[in-house]
Amino acid sequence: CVFCTRLTKPVVQGYNLKLDREPTAKEVWESIDDPKKYDEVVFCGFGEPTLRLDVIKEVAKKIKDSGGRVRLNTNGHGNVINKRNILPELSGLIDEVSVSLNADSSEAYDEICQPLPMFRNGIYEKIKEFIEEAKKHLPEVQASIVTHQRGVDETRCKDIAGKDFGVKYRARRYNIVG
């Protein structure tokens, strides 16, 4: 995305988020320790967490079995990436999904989020389908945008979330954690 500094400066709120390698499910779980210490454990990242769906499912199950709450922050490409509807697999594991809508049209999305060429001209509709499908499988669904993006009608984004899909809406400033 045009607003992301993942490749140039992978730091958010003073935390360097660059990893030398992807952690195993075991390493992720061990780093959490007791999930009840946290309000929630969030699968999020500089990239798309559902690229590692197996890790999400394995760790989320342990978190839920230990009494924790789980949120997934996603770009909504998970069904396309995994070539199947992944949402039924997340039922009972994910308490809330936050889908990065980030635009009010397909054209604006392609310009701002710069999806891979094979996903352009159509991925925005797949994201909206993901939001609609998520409502069938997960208890809480929200659509979010990064605010102050040129050419994006933030009021229309709020309407897409609330009026079109009946989900929560979250406008967030980039580089603000929480």
PLM region spans:
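Active-site groove signature of glycoside hydrolases
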Residues: 38-48
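Conserved AdoMet/S-adenosylmethionine-binding subsite of the radical SAM
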Residues: 29-33, 46-178
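N-terminal pre-catalytic segment of deacetylase/amide-hydrolase enzymes
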Residues: 22-23, 27, 33-36
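Canonical Radical SAM [4Fe-4S] cluster-binding loop centered on the CxxxCxxC motif
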Residues: 1-24
